[in-house]
From Swiss-Prot, chains A, B:
Catalytic residue positions: 106 (proton donor)
Keyword Lyase found: yes
Known pathway: Pyrimidine metabolism; UMP biosynthesis via de novo pathway; UMP from orotate: step 2/2
Pfam families linked to this entry: OMPdecase
Protein name per Swiss-Prot or TrEMBL: Orotidine 5'-phosphate decarboxylase
Keyword Lipoprotein: no
Keywords: Decarboxylase, Lyase, Pyrimidine biosynthesis
Reactions the enzyme catalyzes: orotidine 5'-phosphate + H(+) = UMP + CO2
Sequence intervals crossing the membrane: none
UniProt-recorded Gene Ontology molecular function terms: orotidine-5'-phosphate decarboxylase activity
Organism: Thermoanaerobacter sp. (strain X514)
Domain of life: Bacteria
Family designation: Belongs to the OMP decarboxylase family. Type 2 subfamily.
Enzyme Commission code: 4.1.1.23
């Protein structure tokens, strides 16, 4: 079952950190672009190759210390066919090193269409889980839930997202005296009952932004079944203290994604004097170790986990 | 400007009908599969070729009588790289015959990611417009709006969708005494002010399901700037009477999509004794002509347009 495997991997790696593979060609080290462009030409193929090679370096550097990677499909989809090739190759490489792979696709559509998205990602052995958008309602989520159960996969439904604009729709106050994201949360938590694993969590989880700690605290109580995929840590502004309430009292219940802060760690003030661009992958590893240490330290302070 | 071009095309073709290219391999005529499988093998490549050949037949049969086609990406995305090739080839072929192409992708994500989706579709000359999901808020829509203005493209944001489950989130009552979809509508209508064309409509439109005529009537008034892309007609249950309130008093304001009822018209009770599967494209043309006639007749009855 997806969620049991995820929890066991978090335990084994002693880390709830997920590395987000959101590569941008303009931030890719020149030496990687040189190799890729020489191999495939200075074109879409070369760009896609560079993104893949960049990812491969990151994966090699972190596969033994994180349970999963999250691949944001848009960074590949932007380059069409060649981009998708890099997306699939990245997933394949991550899986080959034992990582769980979350395809961050945020798809959502009517049932007949959702079935096709589910075929694309949940029925694809390269991916362990996907993110989905709940705006169109429960019937549009069910095809993913059915496939999650059938193929031992997971889904994370958007509940309260990390961006500023998440207030526009998600924070609308309803006549039930709650916010829209709480209504979504209740719907997802109810659906998640159908896929609960041996540790009490469901393979149907939720996306809850690191940037809204108060909301996360409420949601942790209102969605007891649901593991949280937490974006927004690091570059988007979320801190260790902000994410603590995403966890339960045993230190589970959340995986914390960081993309830019990890994969471009070598460009940050903290690491730029230590690592050159040639060492971008070591910098990413150092940042993951730092981030994991800080999060685990936060959990120890809360007495959620032992030292 | 996208919306002006769309309106002029509706006038020129005398039809607000959009054909949805949502091909399913299991419903594809055998003679097409035979050709495709012989050419590419009985595999993903062959399936994708069959979907493309099927679409090509439909496009050849309807390009002179409809302003646009809507291509639902999931039906291609399900087949990975090869599927995407068929998706792009379909768009290219439709454009080559002067059709406007709406990529029904329903993407939605934080700004940095939305920019990449916009690069994938709005910055791609194959597509004239895309559908987007507003759940994550205004800041996640703006990258599409900026590109729509810059590249003369359009967007249709989900407001009230055609499926039954659309009630779950979209119909939540808010403390303002309205429904969530009305809050979304207000947000989109406000955003749409930045892209109004010479006929008074904006290149920023809305998806409003044919299956909810009462809601559409309200939304037509609350979103005066916004053209509606109306799914749900035909196979999903929407009738001519259901969609009339999507139009304004001049007979504009909406394009009506039909997918299954058109592309598989030859299998419907109405046409199956007239057309064989070899004539699936003629059947699609006949259905489009019938549908256009019925809609235009409805508009005449309302005195929105002259005979």
């Amino acid at each position: 079952m997806f969620i049991d495997k995820l929890i066991e991997s978090i335990k084994a790696k002693k880390s709830p950190v997920v590395v987000g593979l959101d590569p941008r060609i303009e931030k890719t080290p020149q030496f990687i672009k040189d190799v890729a462009f020489k191999r495939k030409g200075e074109n879409i193929e070369g760009i896609s190759e560079a993104l893949y090679l960049f990812n491969k370096g990151i994966i090699d550097a972190v596969y033994d210390i994180v349970p999963a990677v999250k691949i944001q499909v848009a960074f590949y989809e932007a380059y069409g066919i060649e981009g998708f090739k890099a997306f699939f190759k990245t997933a394949e490489y991550a899986k080959s090193l034992g990582l769980m792979v979350i395809a961050d696709v945020k798809r959502g559509d009517i049932q007949e269409v959702a079935k096709m998205y589910s075929k694309a990602y949940l029925q694809n052995q390269l991916f362990d889980a996907i993110t989905v958008n709940p705006y169109m309602g429960e019937d549009t989520i069910m095809p993913y839930v059915e496939d999650a159960i059938k193929y031992n996969k997971g889904i994370f439904a958007l509940v309260k997202t990390s961006n500023k604009g998440s207030k526009d729709i998600q924070d609308i106050k309803t006549t039930k005296g709650e916010y829209v994201y709480q209504s979504v949360a209740r719907m997802i938590n109810r659906i998640s009952n159908s896929a609960i694993g041996k540790y009490g969590y469901s393979s149907i989880g939720a996306v809850v932004g690191a940037t809204y700690p108060e909301e996360a605290k409420v949601l942790r109580k209102e969605m007891p079944n649901c593991f949280f995929l937490v974006p927004g840590y690091g570059a988007q502004g979320g801190t260790v203290e902000d994410i603590m309430d995403c966890f339960d009292e045993n230190g589970f219940g959340a995986i914390i994604n960081s993309s830019r802060s990890v994969i471009y760690a070598y460009q940050t003030p903290y690491w730029k004097d230590v690592y050159s661009e040639y060492e971008y992958a070591q910098a990413a590893r150092a940042e993951v170790i730092l981030m994991t240490g800080m999060i685990n330290n936060g959990l120890v302070k809360r007495k959620y986990i032992a030292c």
